[in-house]
Swiss-Prot record:
Pfam family, one: FtsJ
Annotated InterPro entries: RNA_methyltr_RlmE (IPR050082), RNA_MeTrfase_FtsJ_dom (IPR002877), rRNA-MeTfrase_E (IPR015507), rRNA_MeTrfase_gammaproteobac (IPR004512), SAM-dependent_MTases_sf (IPR029063)
UniProt-listed HAMAP family: RNA_methyltr_E (MF_01547)
UniProt binding sites for S-adenosyl-L-methionine: 63, 65, 83, 99, 124
Enzyme Commission number, as recorded: 2.1.1.166
CDD domains per record: AdoMet_MTases
Subcellular location, record wording: Cytoplasm
Homology family: Belongs to the class I-like SAM-binding methyltransferase superfamily. RNA methyltransferase RlmE family.
Name of the protein in its database record: Ribosomal RNA large subunit methyltransferase E
Gene: rlmE
Gene Ontology CC annotation, any one: cytoplasm
Any one GO molecular function term: rRNA (uridine-2'-O-)-methyltransferase activity
Keywords tagged on the record: Cytoplasm, Methyltransferase, rRNA processing, S-adenosyl-L-methionine, Transferase
Amino acid sequence: MANKKRSASSSRWLQEHFSDKYVLQAQKKGLRSRAWFKLDEIQQSDKLFKPGMTVVDLGAAPGGWSQYVVTQIGGKGRIIACDILPMDPIVGVDFLQGDFRDELVLKALLERVGDSKVQVVMSDMAPNMSGTPAVDIPKSMYLVELALGMCRDVLAPGGSFLVKVFQGEGFDEYLREIRSLFTKVKIRKPDASRARSREVYIVATGRKL
């Protein structure tokens, strides 16, 4: 019975996905994913990216966010990206394939950042979803805590943090933690984000000293 429910849910998701206007637009424009449109909407309202910036992109594959940010930071900017999945090369993006939860991968990522002053850390990481919130939400919260840990390690004073979070247990505490570290925190739900999805994007700017 559970398998039937899962297959019905998967079929519905696939049907929604391939008829989604943002998926169709992404294909038409030659973009890597519909996530490009989410980031574009956030950039229009929050102006996170400027020419010459150094940006860390966590959960980067297939590359929609990195593809967008390259257009905003220009040739003098730099993106250090990481994902457990492979990603086709993008000019201006230094990509590391590996599991961000692995200490050796984290160490390698920090080495690539080096002494660079990172102005933005962004995370679109998500676990493999089972469809059961009691299982999925804790896994998601673990990833976003790791992303916040990366901010503590590399983000310059005044820098910004953009993170996808699934609303559920632990969300309010996480939001309070971010508010203690940044001067301004907003919650965004871009139009390109599916309405019934629990995902929201926390936009935190002005990292405190």
